[in-house]
């Protein structure tokens, strides 16, 4: 094996010597010349960024022989690349000195960039730098192959087939796709209408409750707890289940209107205009019309004349034998009103309090009423005899 290797080596050396003798001119050419020729042919096609255009006077000194001044670097750069390197070095010196770069140094760079094809910038590794991009390059949005078509894809591979809306990049269907909005407009009701309807409903409800409570109170005297409502003309007692302040205010207004109507009806007949006398029956169901028809009306007129219009409260007292002062009094607040109105209101309040005496909270009203007015106004008749006659007449009805 060793002999065979030695023979093969000797044969190779002989062949190499014979080839070198046949080509003597190739051995005389220096090595750096081959490298320069090879690099010129390889880099001229790989870097077509700048073209040699020596138009200015400052670039006249740059020539192909300039590489001979730098024999070590001439083998690594072509003539065009060396010229561009000196141009960039000169621009860099202006920038370091803080002076303005002359326009004639920048014109060759602009011309070389404009003559290049657009496909070079789409795949250039330095396209993210703005100073390497031409003026017409506006990014990916300007590269729309179909500018008049809607750009919405809806998560698919193909685009929408409709045309874009005027001034937008989507069609009319996809223009509002990304917005968060409700499909139906929400109408907010105004507070004025809501308050007006609530007030109207509360007034209607208060009117119905007022009629119901007044009817039950006047006709049957009210069996539950009593409350006092102050109206415009005076006050009276009623029984009901509502305790809210808003209903009390509505009740007071409605009661004042009812009081005015009752005043007009009292001018014709004092005791038949009330709700309790409309059915002509008492709490036990007995007829009381003959008793009140026989009652003298002169005593009632004297009682109305005796009440003073300036008094703030009307007191009804019953004088018992042996007592000079009144033991039982009925308190009715009439307020400071005019003379004619206070007479009518006082008479209404006395009648109402007389009928409300059937409740559990007004035990001392049982001995009052129109009989007390008549007994107080007439001095000729005896209170005890009249009360005795009243008890006999009520027993006869029973």
Curated annotation (Swiss-Prot):
Keywords: Activator, Nucleus, Transcription, Transcription regulation
Region listing for Disordered, in residue ranges: 1-32, 299-398
WRC domain residues: 144-188
InterPro entries in UniProt: Gln-Leu-Gln_QLQ (IPR014978), GRF (IPR031137), WRC_dom (IPR014977)
Keyword Nucleus: yes
GO biological process: DNA-templated transcription; negative regulation of cell population proliferation; regulation of DNA-templated transcription; regulation of nematode larval development; response to cold; response to gibberellin; response to nematode; root development
Regions of compositional bias (Polar residues) in chain numbering: 299-350, 383-398
Record-annotated QLQ domain positions: 76-111
Entry's Gene Ontology molecular function annotations: ATP binding; transcription cis-regulatory region binding
Tissue distribution of the protein: Strongly expressed in actively growing and developing tissues, such as roots, upper stems, and shoot tips containing the shoot apical meristem (SAM) and flower buds. Also expressed in mature flowers, but weakly expressed in mature stems and leaves.
Major location category of this protein: nucleus
Compartment(s): Nucleus
Keyword Nucleus attached: yes
Motif stretch (Bipartite nuclear localization signal): 149-159, 177-184
UniProt GO cellular component terms: nucleus
Sequence ranges of Low complexity compositional bias: 1-17
Protein induction: microRNA 396 (miR396a or miR396b) negatively regulates growth-regulating factors (GRF1-4 and GRF7-9). Up-regulated in response to cyst nematode infection.
Entry's family note: Belongs to the GRF family.
Function: Transcription activator that plays a role in the regulation of cell expansion in leaf and cotyledons tissues. Component of a network formed by miR396, the GRFs and their interacting factors (GIFs) acting in the regulation of meristem function, at least partially through the control of cell proliferation. microRNA396-GRF1/GRF3 regulatory module acts as a developmental regulator in the reprogramming of root cells during cyst nematode infection, leading to the formation of the syncytium.
Domain remarks: The QLQ domain and WRC domain may be involved in protein-protein interaction and DNA-binding, respectively.
PANTHER family associated with the record: GROWTH-REGULATING FACTOR 3, GROWTH-REGULATING FACTOR 5
Name of the protein in question: Growth-regulating factor 3
Native organism: Arabidopsis thaliana (Mouse-ear cress)
